[in-house]
């Protein structure tokens, strides 16, 4: 479905530029899989997504919140490798810094990693191209079921995110 929308926009079906990010989400009491994200002080899950420059999803992965952004992204790359064959560059935020992540990304996808850093600390500024992935997370948040993790299993949480994106894409 993503490929068809990209063709309608006059683009190739597979993206060459991927923007990645992770979002921590709180669990409800029914969830079995729990982890604690020490950076955001959230007990729950993390959604790792990779989108193109239009905000269309090419990679979705769900882990417990204690998994680092780098480790979750590498897991997602390995799982979604067939969808990411044409990717040449990956844009990420400061949570993905480090040579081991860049080397593992190159080994898995054959893509270079570019880190989008803020120019000044403690000042809000929209980082060009990074807002696209944040907008995609905002689209997911419009789905009421995804505002908290209500699912018992991680795979169920993943499928709910996929269904939410399918509902969004079917409206395009």
Where are these regions (language model features)?
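Short alpha-helical elements
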Residues: 1-172
